[in-house]
Amino acid sequence: MTVLITGSSGGIGRSLARSLPALGWQLRGFDREPAAGDLEQVRGDITDPAALDAAMVGVRAVVHLAGQAVEAPWPVIRDANLEGCYQVFEAARRAGVRRVVYASSNHAVGFTPRPTGDPAELPADTPPRPDTLYGVSKAFGEALARYYVDRYGMQVACLRIGTFAETPPDARSMATWLSPADCARLVDACLRTDQLGFALVWGVSANSGRWWSTDTGQALGYRPLDDAGRHRPGSPGFAAQASDLLVGGAFTTPDFGIDEVADRSPRTRESRSG
């Protein structure tokens, strides 16, 4: 089975391009940037229907990672994460591709208070409560996915990804970390399961202090093995922040908003922020 990875030259894309072939998947990349290694890749932009149509030929599933990675001015968010997301789903529908794994984000629910009590885990179907325009765009993608499932019978897993990194970078990520190996395990499970209709799934490792439930992922066959607790905090960056009372962390603070990023150049269209 050939799987198309959009955003294949980005961080998660490169990681999956290394790990998924060992799990039996034949991959094709789609990105504006050149491919890493010997990955078969179609060069193009996710807002270009013709380029997407070419990339979808012979594909059985799509892992949609491409998009604006963090907060940005609205035109950037709109083009990459709304128009681009729509074009990917439409191209999949035209090509008869029935399964999509969509990279959503915890920032789709970022203003949700972090859980307390026992068990202190938010369910995967926590309602949208976005913390930024970026988060709004990810909530849009989830709603669009639901539409394509209900209207066209597609099968979609929306991964509310936490902090994707080689190791946990800060205190918050001790709860939100998704290791590269567990990311591959999660995507592999979503591609293989015969139980998929529409699913919201937390993209998180088996962290002993995680805020989010892995129940939905495990029902699809996800078996996370990595735990942020095995990594010892060794720097002042591991001090807890007041913003960690909300799921979105620093994205929820008053001084984090469009004014902060208005002068930035757009990032490469591949998702991942914590």
Describe each model-derived feature in a short phrase.
Residues 87-128:
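Conserved Rossmann-fold NAD(P)-dependent oxidoreductase catalytic core, especially the SDR/UDP-sugar
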Residues 3-23:
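N-terminal Rossmann NAD(P)H-binding glycine-rich loop of SDR-like oxidoreductase domains
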Residues 161-167, 177-199, 206:
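Alpha-helical substrate-binding/gating segment
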Residues 47, 76-87, 95, 132, ...:
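Glycine-rich NAD(P)-binding loop of the Rossmann-fold in SDR/ketoreductase-type enzymes
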Residues 200, 206-223, 238-270:
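Conserved C-terminal active-site "lid" loop/helix of NAD(P)H-dependent oxidoreductases
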Residues 23-36:
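Conserved glycine-rich Rossmann-like NAD(P)H-binding loop of the short-chain dehydrogenase/reductase
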Residues 79, 115-153:
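Catalytic helix-loop patch of NAD(P)-dependent Rossmann-fold dehydrogenases
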Residues 36, 43-80:
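NAD(P)H-binding glycine-rich loop region in Rossmannoid oxidoreductase-like domains
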